[in-house]
Amino acid sequence: MDFWKFFPFLALSSMWVLCLASSLQAAPFRSALESSLDLGTLSDQEKHLLLAALIQDYEQKARKLEQEEQETEGSRKGSSSSVISQKRSCNTATCVTHRLAGLLRRSGGVVKDNFVPTNVGSKAFGRRRRDLRV
């Protein structure tokens, strides 16, 4: 009995899906190497502007890398007695947890001085005392 209530809905929905599928067309695939920018159609002024923008972007990236290298060299000279190993960064929960644990370990007594342990014993506040003599 339930099948006859469900059958018209099933038939109409399948017809609707078929109509939608027939009206849709797949977009043509364009490879990453194929570009809409054709250098043959650019004017000389556009080519010069494009080249200037590419050079400016390259110079900005080179300056940024140079500043990062100087910062790392400065930090290495400041702490010449310790060797710093740099690893690839990872953003999974395990990696973040390990990084935070390392940060806490390196911070030393700063966290330990301000940390007050919680009272979690058998005689802790809020625990009910059980009488074994019933």
Curated annotation (Swiss-Prot):
The protein's matches in PROSITE patterns, at most eight in alphabetical order, are given as: CALCITONIN
Show the ranges annotated as biased composition (Low complexity): 77-89
According to the UniProt entry, its GO molecular function terms are:
calcitonin receptor binding; hormone activity
Entry's Gene Ontology cellular component terms: extracellular space
Please state the span of the N-terminal signal peptide per the UniProt entry: 1-26
Give residues where Phenylalanine amide occurs: F125
Pfam families per UniProt? Calc_CGRP_IAPP
Q: Does the keyword Signal apply?
A: yes
Instruction: Tell me yes or no: is rRNA-binding among this UniProt entry's keywords.
Output: no
The propeptide sits at: 27-86, 131-134
Show the segment(s) annotated as Disordered: 65-91
Q: Which cysteines are joined by disulfide bonds?
A: C90-C95
SMART domains linked: CALCITONIN
Give the UniProt keywords, A-Z. Answer: Amidation, Cleavage on pair of basic residues, Disulfide bond, Hormone, Secreted, Signal
Subcellular localization is given as:
Secreted
Q: Which GO terms describe its biological process?
A: adenylate cyclase-activating G protein-coupled receptor signaling pathway; calcitonin gene-related peptide receptor signaling pathway; regulation of cytosolic calcium ion concentration
Q: What does this protein do?
A: CALCB/CGRP2 is a peptide hormone that induces vasodilation mediated by the CALCRL-RAMP1 receptor complex. Dilates a variety of vessels including the coronary, cerebral and systemic vasculature. Its abundance in the CNS also points toward a neurotransmitter or neuromodulator role.
Could you say which protein family the record assigns here? Belongs to the calcitonin family.
Q: What is this protein called?
A: Calcitonin gene-related peptide 2
Q: Which gene encodes it?
A: Calcb
